[in-house]
């Protein structure tokens, strides 16, 4: 690694730099001292972890220990948010910003103080935000390439986009307290009078020479992503969401650990001035002009550059109808199969980074549909099943294609996969469960295409011993074990373990199965009956598995009719909760289950009465609980205790609404007994005969004599 330039840096950090050359490329920034990035370093990096960059680490200045203690305490205070009012917090922020005046650059490049700067950016007023942005002018290329300041810069850019929109729609108003406090400061007045758009354009001018290298830089590439989203007017997603394009996986985890939360400026798109369209064209041109097909394809499979290239393909249609970047990577839509392109697509389908790239360009709206259809037709259509077996790469492409292709092609994919679905899903290795969910969604979108065969395949995989046509009570818990894997889960742990992402994924899949077909609901009932009651209650109190129980509390619609066998199983399933209603009602997760029991006990008034009686027996304790009070209210327990007749009227109304759900009234939808149908037929026939005889009698009387004028009561 080349040494930083400048006598000050060399003298202050001579020993540290010499050590860092042998150990770590970023060691200059290790001990809380922070670094800027030089703007004029043309020598290539020797480390494998960096691209050839124009920047090497340069020192801004040390933050002394007293300052670090002050700013660290300020960051903790803002994080705790113990202010009595918004005015108190605003005053505290003003004092911290005043203390940091002139020190912004060394604070933002300090590991500890950069967290404070990011909080200040999130909480600053519009005028304060402009001041921070102005302090960074002239240093944006350096800050974008720095490990710590790049994160602050990302947040600053999102807030700047919101401020630019305010200026466009004339909603920008200066904070009166800030204006009065700095009224005599010429610099602040100048900054306040400068538009955010003009400062943003100055930043883009400073970054313009570096676009082609930023795309491959570990930190600057994230800043570049946000800039592309802003100038194209696209939505700026949350920086903490799992699938966010703004942050790396490590950054999202770190933000959650230090409890930095996004404000209302995230998760939305903003109006942008017309000048931004030209800047978008400049960025795309700067990236694509030095590239040929070989280098463009290498960027597509580059770990750092690939996400940026995905964004460029997504937005290039705004300024380039010819889609030049797309055609650098792939051939035109009319081109036949090409051996070089075929080899590249095969690599995309086999490589983790490449498959992410191909999945993203299929899912987003940037690439034209005819481009996607050509790639599918030439290189994927004949081997759909083979690609679906690639559990870490190709299967995600198939899932993306199910969302985008025309109905005929979707049905072709379903024809290939559904007969082999049970062999594609691996329970032990947790593979292709999401494929099952995607196939269900695709089947629903095609009017339940091959529904029965799909259900058969799913049962064959997850409950091979279950008899769908004749469910019996001797069913085992195989569905739970195969889908949820309860034996190796956090269920029943006493260490307050958080549910894992894998448990959430599996629970959502089982919920999807229950939504798809009612036979899975009945199977879940029987699996619950096969569990020890203690284990079932643990599921009800679990942060994830409680949702499975909750989704199992559904009754067949009146239009379909509930078979007697299913009604009996529903009663037996309800018996599992007997004696546990109080515990469930007072639990944060179990209370939702008790709420669902109100609808689940429709047409079973005795069970509904029994549940309400259990709560009434523990009335004081239920009402002392936050969650219990909500359940008490949702079950209208005050009526049950004081006016039970009115409570029973509610129960009757629920039954009427259940039968009227298809738009008919009362008992019209109710399935009648044979004797009731016969009596109704006799009554209608008799009524018709009486009306006909009455009409014939009136006609006869009218033809033989005049109608007599009624008098008195008979009038």
From Swiss-Prot:
Write out the annotated subcellular location. Answer: Nucleus, Nucleolus
BP term (GO), one: endonucleolytic cleavage in ITS1 to separate SSU-rRNA from 5.8S rRNA and LSU-rRNA from tricistronic rRNA transcript (SSU-rRNA, 5.8S rRNA, LSU-rRNA)
Does the keyword Nucleus feature in the UniProt annotation? yes
Q: Which GO terms describe its molecular function?
A: RNA binding
Primary residence? nucleus
- Any one cellular-component term (Gene Ontology): preribosome, small subunit precursor
Pumilio repeat windows:
99-134, 135-170, 206-243, 291-326, 340-377, 379-415, 531-568, 575-613
Q: Which cysteines are joined by disulfide bonds?
A: none
InterPro entries registered for this protein in UniProt: ARM-like (IPR011989), ARM-type_fold (IPR016024), NOP9 (IPR040000), Pumilio_RNA-bd_rpt (IPR001313)
Q: Which UniProt keywords apply?
A: Nucleus, Repeat, Ribosome biogenesis, rRNA processing
Q: Which domain of life is it from?
A: Eukaryota
- Protein's job: RNA-binding nucleolar protein required for pre-rRNA processing. Involved in production of 18S rRNA and assembly of small ribosomal subunit.
Which protein is depicted?
A: Nucleolar protein 9
Which source organism does the UniProt entry give?
A: Clavispora lusitaniae (strain ATCC 42720)
Gene that codes for this? NOP9
């Amino acid at each position: 690694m080349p040494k930083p330039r400048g006598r000050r840096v060399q003298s202050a950090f001579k020993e540290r730099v010499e050590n860092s050359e042998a150990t770590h490329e970023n060691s200059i920034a290790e001990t809380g001292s922070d670094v800027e990035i030089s703007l004029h370093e043309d020598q290539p990096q020797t480390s494998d972890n960096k691209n050839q960059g124009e920047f090497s680490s340069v020192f801004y200045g040390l933050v002394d220990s007293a300052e670090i203690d002050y700013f660290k305490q300020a960051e903790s205070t803002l994080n705790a948010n113990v202010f009595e009012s918004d005015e108190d917090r605003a005053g505290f922020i003003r004092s911290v910003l005043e203390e940091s005046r002139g020190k912004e650059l060394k604070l933002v490049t300090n590991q500890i103080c950069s967290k404070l700067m990011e909080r200040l950016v999130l909480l600053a007023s519009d005028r304060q935000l402009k001041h921070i942005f102005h302090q960074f002018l002239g240093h944006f290329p350096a800050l974008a390439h720095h490990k710590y300041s790049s994160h602050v810069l990302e947040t600053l850019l999102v807030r700047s986009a919101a401020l630019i929109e305010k200026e466009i729609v004339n909603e920008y108003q200066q904070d009166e307290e800030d204006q009065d406090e700095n009224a005599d400061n010429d610099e602040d007045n100048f900054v306040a009078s400068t538009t955010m758009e003009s400062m943003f354009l100055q930043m883009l001018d400073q970054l313009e020479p570096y676009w082609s290298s930023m795309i491959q830089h570990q930190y600057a590439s994230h800043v570049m992503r946000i800039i592309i989203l802003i100038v194209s007017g696209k939505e700026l997603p949350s920086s903490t969401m799992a699938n966010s394009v703004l942050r790396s996986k490590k950054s999202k985890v770190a933000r959650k650990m230090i409890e930095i939360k996004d404000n209302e400026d995230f998760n939305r798109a903003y109006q942008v001035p017309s000048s931004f369209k030209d800047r978008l064209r400049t960025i795309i041109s700067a990236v694509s002009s030095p590239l040929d097909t070989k280098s463009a394809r290498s960027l597509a499979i580059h770990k750092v550059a690939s996400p940026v290239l995905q964004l460029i393909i997504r937005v290039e249609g705004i300024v380039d109808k010819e889609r030049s970047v797309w055609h650098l990577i792939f051939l035109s839509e009319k081109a036949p199969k090409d051996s070089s392109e075929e080899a590249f697509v095969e690599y995309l389908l086999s490589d983790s980074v490449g498959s992410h790239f191909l999945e993203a360009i299929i899912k987003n709206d940037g690439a034209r549909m005819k481009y996607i259809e050509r790639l599918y037709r030439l290189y994927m259509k004949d081997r759909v099943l083979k690609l679906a077996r690639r559990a870490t790469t190709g299967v995600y492409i198939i899932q993306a294609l199910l969302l985008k292709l025309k109905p005929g092609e979707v049905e072709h994919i379903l024809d290939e996969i559904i007969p082999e679905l049970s062999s594609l899903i691996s329970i032990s290795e947790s593979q292709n469960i999401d494929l099952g969910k995607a196939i269900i969604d695709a089947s629903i979108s095609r009017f339940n295409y091959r529904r029965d065969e799909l259900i058969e395949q799913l049962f064959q995989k997850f409950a091979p011993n279950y008899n769908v046509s004749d469910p019996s009570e001797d069913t085992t818990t195989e569905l739970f074990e195969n889908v949820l894997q309860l034996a190796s889960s956090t269920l029943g742990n006493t260490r307050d373990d958080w549910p894992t992402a894998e448990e959430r994924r599996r629970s959502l899949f089982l919920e999807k199965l229950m939504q798809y077909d009612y036979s899975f609901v009945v199977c879940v009932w029987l699996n619950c009956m096969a569990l020890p009651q203690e284990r079932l209650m643990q599921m009800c109190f679990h942060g994830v598995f409680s949702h499975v129980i909750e989704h199992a509390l559904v009754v067949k619609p009146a239009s379909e009719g509930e078979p007697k066998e299913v009604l009996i199983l529903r009663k037996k399933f309800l018996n599992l909760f007997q004696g546990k209603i109080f515990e469930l009602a007072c639990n944060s997760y179990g209370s939702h289950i008790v709420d669902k029991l109100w609808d689940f006990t429709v047409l079973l008034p005795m069970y509904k009465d029994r549940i309400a009686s259990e709560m009434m027996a523990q009335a004081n304790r239920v009402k002392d609980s936050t969650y219990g009070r909500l359940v008490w209210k949702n079950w209208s327990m005050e009526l049950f205790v004081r006016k039970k007749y009115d409570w029973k009227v509610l129960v009757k109304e629920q039954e009427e609404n259940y039968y009227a759900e298809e738009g008919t009234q009362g008992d019209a939808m109710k399935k009648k007994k044979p004797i009731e149908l016969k009596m109704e037929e006799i009554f209608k026939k008799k009524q018709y005969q009486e009306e006909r005889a009455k009409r014939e009698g009136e006609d006869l009387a009218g033809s033989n004599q005049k109608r007599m004028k009624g008098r008195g009561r008979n009038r």
